[in-house]
Amino acid sequence: MSEPRKILVTSALPYANGSIHLGHMLEYIQTDMWVRFQKLRGNQCIYVCADDAHGSAIMLRAEKEGITPEQLIANVQAEHCADFAEFLVDFDNFHSTHAEENRELSSQIYLKLRDAGHIATRSITQYFDPEKKMFLADRFIKGTCPKCGTEDQYGDNCEKCGATYAPTDLKDPKSAISGATPVLKDSQHFFFKLPDFQQMLQSWTRSGTLQDAVANKIAEWLDAGLQQWDISRDAPYFGFEIPDEPGKYFYVWLDAPIGYMASFKNLCSRRPELDFDAFWGKDSTAELYHFIGKDIVNFHALFWPAMLEGAGYRKPTGINVHGYLTVNGQKMSKSRGTFIKARTYLEHLSPEYLRYYYASKLGRGVDDLDLNLEDFVQKVNSDLVGKVVNIASRCAGFIHKGNAGVMVDSNAAPELTEAFLAAAPSIADAYEARDFARAMREIMGLADRANAWIADKAPWSLNKQEGKQDEVQAICATGIILFRQLVIFLKPVLPLLAADAEAFLNVAPLTWNDHQQLLANHQLNKFKPLMTRIDPVKVQAMTDASKEDLAASQTDTGGPKGNGELVKDPLSAEIDFDAFAAIDLRVALIVKAEAVEGADKLLRLTLDIGDEQRNVFSGIKSAYPDPSKLDGRLTMMIANLKPRKMKFGISEGMVMAAGPGGEEIYLLSPDSGAKPGQRIK
């Protein structure tokens, strides 16, 4: 028998500035299932994580709440730990980056990089808030877009026109923190010489450590040439001060991944059998895997391995990247109630429902995963309750009533039992490859075969026939044998179900190799329901509660703040989908635009909507004093609006525009390629 593998596993560190939501949970559940599988197989697998507890955002939120940053991160960590525990995410250690182990390791790694010549310094010019006495990151600067003139845009890109720019390009810049006009100021910054590791990274990222799609994306950055990475921030900043550089702090993304090492080192201090160097030393033979989302690939596949290489530590064995979570086919939305916090979910539904659904959809690629709430209900109810648990509930009663709960020593389906045993290597391979969806398909295929066999044998009918009781006991004992096999295969995904099944089966905690042994002449405990069906009403209550979370947060903050459009023009009352669906929006070509004699605000628009022309009066004259410039332009119109008789004629629809009025009216246009008459949906 081969020696157990030594494996260290991490998930990305959640930021200690907010609650965990179901998008976050995708990663932690994925990682936990893989770790549980390794432990079930007898491998030494250690799972560590920590809160990412540094940065300006945490400092500013703590200030706003009137508490210290240390108090804030302690409060958030308690919330995170409770959510993870109830979702059955079983960390060996959950630490914080604001810890002495992380301070020591961050300083040590920085000094090794500095002494090896991998740190550069140079002066950079940044905006500085004269009231808060702090340099401003791009997201803390707002102003007018230099390209389209839209107000209240961030310092690096415009949300309206999509333009990107430097903060110094903004017109009328303001500090988003104090509202003060920032001034430009020079500061010395420290840079990690990432280009020093170009050759190593080109080789390492193609060595099987990354999925092919991720390696291809990284290759684009490598081919474009790596740039030095700014690793410093100026005081005031919540983080670790750079050694020998008072007033200069490590950028949060330098000490965050070092938090993996710090969490493990903290665990080593409490578990003397663990050796830090055996897992992190340059010559370590242990396996090291990071599970992350695709949004932070560059930090983990470029900066992190280069830092480790430069400081004399080992590099990861693999970086396992997953996609984003969507809900009902769309980005999570607070207004739709699909931006669901972990705590909100737990208040309504069992964590194992979601664990199974994620497992059934998770492959080894980086595609996004959709949580379709209708499919979620159907799949869990059908697979777990209707297939797996159904086997035990069908068989247990006959064994208790007919043989005092003792399974007879009889296998009524040797070929089917052998098929279950033979499936174990393939299911194990799927788990190992993180292809949880394939593992679930194979397991549910076995469950289907077991249910079909039991239905064919129909012990409930046989039990009514004289002299068939021994056959009934043999059938039901075989059903329990098959159920036990399924429980073993599902244990990494459904640890609570497995524990309850172990109690019913009257066995010690099951391991993977237990699938090779069959129960015979074995006393069962009384059967209790192992899982109930999802009630769709509870799912609706969960989404309703998520909408209430949004309403509460807006109430807490007094609604939208600042000079944004929602303050000037609040959202209208909600409408249902049917009301929206009744509106027929179409692409329209402006054939001719002309002034209306005797009307100060109106233009007469002749619109082509494909197979017919419409006459529409629109109050946009103040913004378009030369209406001929609109000729030939595509716009959008409401095509099924009841014709309206006006002083100057009949208006057969309405064109769509934005803006407060006057000269600030902006006629909406579809993207290039749209054709007159096409429906907008």
Swiss-Prot record:
Entry binding sites for Zn(2+): C145, C148, C158, C161
Cofactor stoichiometry and binding remark: Binds 1 zinc ion per subunit.
EC id: 6.1.1.10
Record's keyword terms, sorted: Aminoacyl-tRNA synthetase, ATP-binding, Cytoplasm, Ligase, Metal-binding, Nucleotide-binding, Protein biosynthesis, RNA-binding, tRNA-binding, Zinc
Gene Ontology MF annotations: ATP binding; metal ion binding; methionine-tRNA ligase activity; tRNA binding
Reactions catalysed according to its record: tRNA(Met) + L-methionine + ATP = L-methionyl-tRNA(Met) + AMP + diphosphate
GO terms under cellular component: cytosol
Localization per Swiss-Prot or TrEMBL: Cytoplasm
Family annotation (Pfam families): tRNA-synt_1g, tRNA_bind
Motif 'HIGH' region in this chain: 14-24
Superkingdom, taxonomy of origin: Bacteria
Database matches in NCBIfam families: metG, metG_C_term, PRK00133.1
Complex and partners: Homodimer.
PANTHER family: METHIONINE--TRNA LIGASE, METHIONINE--TRNA LIGASE, CYTOPLASMIC
UniProt family annotation: Belongs to the class-I aminoacyl-tRNA synthetase family. MetG type 1 subfamily.
Function of the molecule: Is required not only for elongation of protein synthesis but also for the initiation of all mRNA translation through initiator tRNA(fMet) aminoacylation.
Designated name of the protein: Methionine--tRNA ligase
Gene that produces this protein: metG
